[in-house]
Amino acid sequence: MDYKVKVRYLRIGRRKVARLLPFVKGEYVNHAISNLATMPQMSSVVLRKAIKSGIANAIFQSRNINPDTLWVKTAFVDKAPTLKRIRAASRGSADPILKRLSHITIILSDDKKPEKKKLKAKSAKTEEAPKAAEV
């Protein structure tokens, strides 16, 4: 079963949050939380809180779930409305200040986590190009 967590109108830019998502996607929740605990970015605190909230949601919705089996199925960040402010500039003009917001969505799953596919190593032999026909 899937459990969805949404953090809306977060006062951190979308790109700042998106930098940390590869450390969370596809990981077990305990491993994702420990990954985020070592990161200095403010968005890591918010992501960690969101994952813990997802664990609490999963336990509340189905009482017999083991939190160790939960893993992050998907995690993405969307653009939210921008707060527009004005800063006074020279000669009576104004410069815009754009305070960007974001929405975070995390989906946790207790289904069996798929195995990562192993890439096949290329053979040491290099194929030769076919010779051009003689005229």
UniProtKB/Swiss-Prot annotation:
GO cellular component terms listed in the entry, alphabetical order: cytosolic large ribosomal subunit
SUPFAM superfamilies according to UniProt: Ribosomal protein L22
Compositional bias (Basic and acidic residues): 124-135
GO biological process, one term: translation
Gene3D superfamilies in alphabetical order: Ribosomal protein L22/L17 (3.90.470.10)
Protein name per UniProt: Large ribosomal subunit protein uL22
Organism domain of life: Bacteria
Subunit-structure text: Part of the 50S ribosomal subunit.
Role of this protein: This protein binds specifically to 23S rRNA; its binding is stimulated by other ribosomal proteins, e.g. L4, L17, and L20. It is important during the early stages of 50S assembly. It makes multiple contacts with different domains of the 23S rRNA in the assembled 50S subunit and ribosome. The globular domain of the protein is located near the polypeptide exit tunnel on the outside of the subunit, while an extended beta-hairpin is found that lines the wall of the exit tunnel in the center of the 70S ribosome.
Keywords for this protein: Ribonucleoprotein, Ribosomal protein, RNA-binding, rRNA-binding
InterPro entries: Ribosomal_uL22, Ribosomal_uL22_bac/chlpt-type, Ribosomal_uL22_bac/org-type, Ribosomal_uL22_sf
Keyword rRNA-binding assigned: yes
Segments for region (Disordered): 112-135
Family, as annotated: Belongs to the universal ribosomal protein uL22 family.
Alphabetical list of NCBIfam families matching this protein: rplV_bact
HAMAP family xrefs: Ribosomal_uL22_B (MF_01331_B)
Organism annotation: Brachyspira hyodysenteriae (strain ATCC 49526 / WA1)
Cysteine disulfide partners in this protein: none
GO MF term set: rRNA binding; structural constituent of ribosome
The organism's taxonomic lineage, starting at the top: Bacteria, Pseudomonadati, Spirochaetota, Spirochaetia, Brachyspirales
